[in-house]
């Protein structure tokens, strides 16, 4: 039996994983549950982990997996339910002798180069190579992939060297992680917020300042839907 706060937090994490492919930060959890400190979130996370509803992944920034869901949130995840984060093994890593082959419908996406998760870099529009992603990750619409350069989104679980999967769109809701084109020349991966006639591009790393620009200087090029990480 979960308390109301535990259930509310689990639902919030689940919805963010479904929407963004990455879990919310502790600050976002604190605001969503109207708590005064992060210590309350730590206690709730620990309780959910002890009860087997979530799993924290070691040595990764803000990495949480949902293991199961209570009936009030739709029951346990169906077969194949996974956060939309792919941890890829190195190609030279030996396969266990008892490993069974698994067939997954894959889609080839163009990797359009590197995107800055830091100071914006020049916009890239040339395909460097292709990457295979599960078909369930992309859904409808046009998609492409970008390799992340920088550490400004580490608290969103996005690290330097990760490959992000982007759905093409020219619109975004507040809080979406987007590919933003600044002045038609610089591309950056940031969280999007509309502030009146301006656009705020917010990093997920306190070392980076939020950039607030007139809306006519920013064009949304796509929204984050998944992430691929190789060790």
Curated annotation (Swiss-Prot):
Which residue ranges are recorded for the region named Disordered? 79-98
The EC number on file is: 3.4.21.88
Instruction: Cite the active-site annotation.
Output: 152 (for autocatalytic cleavage activity), 190 (for autocatalytic cleavage activity)
Q: Which PANTHER family match?
A: LEXA REPRESSOR, LEXA REPRESSOR-RELATED
Organism of provenance: Ruegeria pomeroyi (strain ATCC 700808 / DSM 15171 / DSS-3)
Cite a single Pfam family from the UniProt record: Peptidase_S24
* Subunit architecture: Homodimer.
Matches recorded under Gene3D superfamilies: Umud Fragment, subunit A, Winged helix-like DNA-binding domain superfamily/Winged helix DNA-binding domain
Catalysed reactions, semicolon-separated:
Hydrolysis of Ala-|-Gly bond in repressor LexA
Which keywords accompany this UniProt record?
Autocatalytic cleavage, DNA damage, DNA repair, DNA replication, DNA-binding, Hydrolase, Repressor, SOS response, Transcription, Transcription regulation
Name the encoding gene, please: lexA
Q: What is this protein called?
A: LexA repressor
- Described purpose of this protein according to its UniProt entry: Represses a number of genes involved in the response to DNA damage (SOS response), including recA and lexA. In the presence of single-stranded DNA, RecA interacts with LexA causing an autocatalytic cleavage which disrupts the DNA-binding part of LexA, leading to derepression of the SOS regulon and eventually DNA repair.
